[in-house]
Amino acid sequence: MSNKLYQVLFVCTGNACRSPMAQGILEHLLPEDYRSKVKVTSAGTAAIENSPASSQAIAVAKEHGIDISKHRAQELSESLLRNSNIVFVMAKEHYQYIAQHYPQYRDNVFLLKSFDRKPNRRRHTDVPDPIGRPQGFYRRVFQELENEIRRILPRLLQLVDTNS
């Protein structure tokens, strides 16, 4: 039995909206007995180090009882990818960035909306970036993230169990 934490990484562009909300949602939804087994982090392909999450993302998360106010952005790095068991990206551009800059890790990288799903050419696979958009758009993105994380959670917990 391994004592190593199962590490989940969410990646977006600025690490200010989508990935911090996704991180907060997964941490919130993790069953109590998994919280000591799983470490959830987030990063951005073009993040400004130590920037807070956007005020709209913080407000929308708070509406759902999730506090991401202490979040500080970090740039995606080789060490973050190396230490992650699984990486969920918000859009194809993030997958392509990792495939180009860190090809050795691409087998652990998945589009959040495509993970554990049969391919469907009509399904939109990107989670839209809410930066600069109205609060209602942030709410829709939050709901989309929550729906996707609820959908993948059973499979993710299986992966954690397999790893321990």
Annotate each PLM feature.
Residues 2-83, 154-164:
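Conserved active-site segments centered on acidic
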Residues 12, 61, 88-89, 145:
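Hydrophobic structural packing positions in well-ordered secondary structure
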Residues 52-59, 89-92, 111:
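Short, charged low-complexity intrinsically disordered segments located at boundaries
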Residues 86, 92-164:
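Phosphate-binding/catalytic loops
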